[in-house]
UniProtKB/Swiss-Prot annotation:
GO molecular function, one term: structural constituent of ribosome
Superkingdom assignment: Eukaryota
CDD domains: Ribosomal_L22
Highest classification ranks of the organism: Eukaryota, Viridiplantae, Streptophyta, Embryophyta, Tracheophyta
Keyword match Plastid: yes
UniProt function note: This protein binds specifically to 23S rRNA.
Family membership: Belongs to the universal ribosomal protein uL22 family.
InterPro entries: Ribosomal_uL22, Ribosomal_uL22_bac/chlpt-type, Ribosomal_uL22_bac/org-type, Ribosomal_uL22_CS, Ribosomal_uL22_sf
Name of the molecule in the record: Large ribosomal subunit protein uL22c
Pfam families linked: Ribosomal_L22
One Gene Ontology term from the biological process aspect of the record: translation
Keywords: Chloroplast, Plastid, Ribonucleoprotein, Ribosomal protein, RNA-binding, rRNA-binding
Length: 141
């Protein structure tokens, strides 16, 4: 599968993998925060009564720390541009039952992808990303 590109000048990604919760339960929380600002998202996640909100809270906090470290942007200027939950592998266990038998137990896991976008910065053009600058002769009047 082809990896999707993103604009690294104004966006920061954070991944969480193999979280022991079904993707359906996690999507219930992710759908509430998609497209909101960083501060508003943290407030919503603190007040939600779901168990799924804590791993998402930690991941968004980590993504904001990545943004401030790599891009030097303020956390207040961040916006959640993409929030995605995918199903992971199943953790398989055997539960002992009567007469020496065993029943399989499958626990679902999920993967979360959060992309934070900086509202204050504008995306660079292709030439600026490739060469680091844009000269008037490169544009070609």
């Amino acid at each position: 599968m082809k990896k999707k590109r993103f604009n690294s000048d104004i966006e920061v990604q954070a991944f969480a993998r193999h979280i022991c919760m079904s993707a359906h339960k996690m999507r219930r929380v992710i759908d509430q925060i998609r497209g909101r600002s960083y501060e508003q998202t943290l407030m919503i996640l603190e007040l939600m009564p779901y168990r799924a909100s804590y791993p998402i809270f930690r991941l968004i906090y980590s993504a904001a720390a990545n943004a401030s470290k790599t891009m030097g942007s303020k956390e207040a200027d961040s916006l959640i541009s993409k929030a995605e939950v995918n199903e992971g592998t199943f953790i398989k266990k055997l539960k002992p039952r009567a007469r020496g038998r065993s029943y399989p137990i499958k626990k679902p896991t999920c993967h979360i992808i959060i992309v934070l976008k900086d509202k204050s910065k504008k995306p660079k053009s292709f030439l600026e990303r490739k060469y680091g600058f844009v000269d008037k002769y490169m544009i070609g009047k």
